[in-house]
Amino acid sequence: GDESATFKVDKIKHNNIEIWIQYPHRKHSQYNKLALGVPQHLSNNLPQYQDKSYDVSFAGQITHQRRQELSKAMPTIANSFYEPTEGFAQGLNPKSYYDKMFISKIIPCPSGQVVIDSFRFYETIEMLCLPIADNIDSKGNTMNYYNFLFEEEVPVKTIDNWNLLQTLVPELLSDYPNNMHQIVCWWIKYKRNLFIELMRQINA
């Protein structure tokens, strides 16, 4: 993907075209924006149904300032699972990763390497968990990224300071699973509407 937005999409000229951008930046406001979604291997590693036993879990790489901030907050959270890794795909295997996620209620979703969007945000929802979305990217820029990406108010809690996670978790748990159901329903509706819009553009 073009996460750094180096491809000059504005140079594309055609009288009958729809352009979709994954990892959109602010300069892509006029284009169709496509969510990153889940990795292909999720469908082959779906966990068996289990009760939620962790309040919070995070397994992933600690590579930039937002994840470093989260790495200091996670050990302070009661009833949590925390598995830091040194790099992408260097931690739990996919089956174990999704098993741990599925038995958790809340998943912090720190910024991706360049933009805020990441596989984890969508994996979290597909695993019937409640995501906490980052409001700050890896370079320290503040942006309500998911509202920008989906061009609507996304029903997800966002955070500017991961050190406040310990305070935020009890607040989210007090409304769980209602808040989780809300984001899952929103995601199902988005996927349906995306299919409808793609078919409309193809048939136009």
Predicted regions and their residues:
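Conserved donor-nucleotide binding/catalytic region of nucleotide-linked donor-dependent transferases
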Residues: 164-186
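Nucleotide-sugar donor-binding catalytic core of glycosyltransferases
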Residues: 1-154, 158, 185-203
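Residues at or immediately preceding the N-termini of alpha-helices
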Residues: 94, 162-165
